[in-house]
């Protein structure tokens, strides 16, 4: 099964899906440094599957440069990383890049979660108005545009537990309304303790 990773960050979410046997179509991330990490991990997974992991190990030992590492991998693998900010200004370009990679295939899964600062308890506590004016509160609308366009069989929207209470729960209720009533998905929400799955974190998600 394939998947699209939105708000990909450095790719931690994707690592789990790849280990579970899913194939990435695209990782969309605005941060340049995070995209370098995504490309490096794409190179790792390709070289490992091709039996050429020695090239990756040479990179880890600084025996070859990052450019030399990338040169050992088909360009199509690295082109799965799309270094653009999700939003009105870039969505059409992102759609085009993803469409080209799909080549008329359907999308099985969309994963990802917008930046959590606007929803997190810590972020809201530090803000004079509880982050209510932060545009990141509404990035779930952009996420929904990808669901509407690609109609995946399922999706995983991940965020911090503070999403339940941000703006007295209004954002969360709007999100559920959009996913269920407008897009027609059966939605289940639940809290996961990351530490219960071998992660060195205390946050719940």
Please state what every model-predicted region is:
Residues 12, 94-97, 139-142:
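Well-ordered alpha-helical segments embedded in enzymatic catalytic cores
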Residues 20-107:
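Glycine-rich phosphate-binding loop and adjoining beta1-alpha1-beta2 segment
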Residues 10-22:
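Conserved SAM-binding loop of SAM-dependent methyltransferases across substrates and taxa
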Residues 100-104, 119-205:
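Class I S-adenosyl-L-methionine
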Residues 7-10, 112-114:
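Class I SAM-dependent methyltransferase "Motif I" SAM/SAH-binding loop
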Residues 108-116, 151:
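Short coil-to-beta-strand
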Residues 1-9, 106:
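Conserved class I S-adenosyl-L-methionine
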Residues 3, 110, 155:
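Receiver (REC) domain switch-region micro-motif
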């Amino acid at each position: 099964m394939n998947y699209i990773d939105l708000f990909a960050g450095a790719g931690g979410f994707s690592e789990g899906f790849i280990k579970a046997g899913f194939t990435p179509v695209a990782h969309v991330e605005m941060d340049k440094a995070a995209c370098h990490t995504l490309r490096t991990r794409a190179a790792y997974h390709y070289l490992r599957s091709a039996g050429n992991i020695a090239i990756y190990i040479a990179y880890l030992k600084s025996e070859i440069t990052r450019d030399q590492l990338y040169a050992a991998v088909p360009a199509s693998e690295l082109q799965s990383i799309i270094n653009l900010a999700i939003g009105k200004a870039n969505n059409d370009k992102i759609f085009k890049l993803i469409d080209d990679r799909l080549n008329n295939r359907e999308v099985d899964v969309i994963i990802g979660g917008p930046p959590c600062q606007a929803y997190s308890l810590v972020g809201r506590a530090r803000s004079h108005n509880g982050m209510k004016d932060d545009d990141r509160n509404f990035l779930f609308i952009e996420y929904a545009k990808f669901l509407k366009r690609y109609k995946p069989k399922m999706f995983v929207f991940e965020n911090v537990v503070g999403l339940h209470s941000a703006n007295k729960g209004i954002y969360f209720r709007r999100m559920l309304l959009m996913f269920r009533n407008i897009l027609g998905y059966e939605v289940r929400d639940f809290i996961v303790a990351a530490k219960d799955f071998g992660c060195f974190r205390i946050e719940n998600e």
